[in-house]
Amino acid sequence: MKQLLAIFALLLSSLPALAQNNAAAQANIIRPGDNLVLENIPAIPAAIAEKAFQYGEVRAAALQDWDGSRREMLIITRFADVPQVHVVKMPGGARTQLTFFPDRVGGAHYGPKGSNYFTFVKDVGGGEWFQFYRYDLADGNVTLLTDGKSRNTGRAFAHNDNRFAYSSTRRTGQDTDIWIMDATNPKTDRTLLQLEGGGWGATDWSPDNQKLLVLQEISANQSYLWLVDAASSEKKLLTPKAGAEEVAYSGGTFSKDGKGFYTTTDRDSEFKRLAYFDFATMKPAYLTPDTKWDVDEFDLSDDGRTLAFVANEDGVGKLYLMDTTTRKYHSVSGLPAGQVFGLSFHKDNLELGFVVNSASSPSDVYSLNVPTGKVERWTFSETGGLNTATFSTPQLIKWQTFDSKTISGYLYAPDPKKFPGKRPVIVNIHGGPEGQFRPGFLGRNNYYLNELGVALVFPNVRGSSGYGKSFLKQDNGMNRDHTHKDIGALLDWIRQSPNLDGGKIMITGGSYGGYMTWAVAYEYNGKICCSLPIVGPSNLVTLLEHTEAYRRDLRRVEYGDERDPKIREYLEKTAPLNNSEKIQKPVFAAVGKNDPRVPWTESRQMLDKLKGNGITIWFLMANDEGHGYAKKKNQDFLFYATVMFVRQFLLGENVSAAAK
């Protein structure tokens, strides 16, 4: 009995030490939040975050709108967990936060000149059921304007008026009707047009606020512009289909005299040019006839005299100003090389606001004084204390694919002095699929370059935008697997490169890039080390059957209609889900439970089939996210888990929670 008591006493005396040891062990790992679901992801050593942490402490800013009466603006940036609305009252001034929500906020727009409010857009948990709100500047009160249930998008604001037109799925959950509301009185909300399809959106009001331009999008290659009477709802097709050619339009802005409108279109061209249509003749006058690149966006000054536009020149944004009377234009100098977007003229017609993103700087807001050419920087986003001047600059690369076409992309290489020899590679495939990788600030991805010596390649395979409408169509329907072969050719190009290690390649991508990651993982299993699909479809048939209804027909134009037996057979044959037995390398899949575009079950069904392959499978799901991670805490955990995955399965390191 005494012996038992002695043993019991010994056990009791050891409990504090055991508790201390357990606490120390817990302190040495990065703990996931209760909102995260993990499968097979080992405990992440806290040491991983010691250097990687800085790369996540980077901010960015996006211009939302100018104040109509003062020289100040609304921007979106993040100081806590998610982006919120801030006001900046001078170049380089303080970013004063106005909204405080647990979910991301965007689309902030001031009311008309003399008003004392702005409207903004917000969803919950990444579900993309966007609602409009009004923020009263006098007291900070927030009012819900829409129904709180449907998906509401695409606002167009009347001139010097509280009304705005917008798109909503309220009636059917699938079709986007056009509605009009007075932002100061939600009870004025009314339906302007009942429509079929999910691709409708108002773009502008006429100068007298009597009519609206409305864009109908069928696909990335096909869209139409309509003229709609704001009182009677009568609509007229302005851009009927002419012959067999599919034509795309982007945006639509009335001229100041109301006699015509500006838009960008690939009509009669491979690329989207800036054009003016006179209502009397409806014959286009191409304002940038010699451009060999897409015009990405444009904005017209309030007096109608100056038109600013951005040309996408091989992925680099070039800003131009045009005199609408002479139609002569010139480029704007003195800007960092990179992406330029978010154009917005001040009501004074003197200043143009925009955002610049470059390899050494995250997105920040600038202004241009049009008469003097003076450029001023309004925001200076933090970069985690990192010396961004030393960051890798992108190199344009090109390779021949299976059918002799030339495919291009961008290579970011580590410093050869710090990391000599052939370097491991991460191939990161963009989404869309009609997207385009454009060189700019890489954020957390700079960690792999600067700290691990891993090169990054961002391909623009066929079907990417920015290279002409013929190139954009080359992956449609039953040509889907041609894009896989473009990556296969890239893998061969990497193996032949004198500076890259073709034996150490990881594939990753988000959304459609996630689908491509799954596809490459099975088609080129022997040429890669591991893969990381993020919110990626595993079967385009099940994707089309389960994506939200308002998206389905738009995606069918791109992927093919799964209700057609021949298309369905092809999609099933090439689906990664139905070729899962060929994947024999480690996989890490990350999803958001509320994703309306690619349901999380796309990854779940794939991982369930992969379990029989006897390979390493990691899975991460955020219960409070959708199509990608918007909350910093979730981004951080995914980043640290990815770093561990890269170090273990691409670089071959022994990484564990016990590692120092």
How would you name each of these model-derived features?
Residues 21-60, 88-104, 125, 135-151, ...:
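Multi-bladed beta-propeller domains
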Residues 63-72, 108-117, 155-163, 203-211, ...:
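Blade-terminus and WD-like Trp-Asp/Gly-His loop motifs, strongest in beta-propeller folds
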Residues 78-82, 125-130, 170-176, 218-223, ...:
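Short, solvent-exposed loop/turn segments at conserved positions within beta-propeller repeat blades
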Residues 377-420:
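N-terminal cap/lid segment of alpha/beta-hydrolase-fold proteins
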Residues 413, 420-431:
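Short beta-strand element of the alpha/beta-hydrolase
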Residues 440-459:
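Short amphipathic alpha-helix adjacent to the substrate-entry channel of hydrolases
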Residues 451, 458-660:
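Active-site-proximal cap/loop segments of hydrolase catalytic domains
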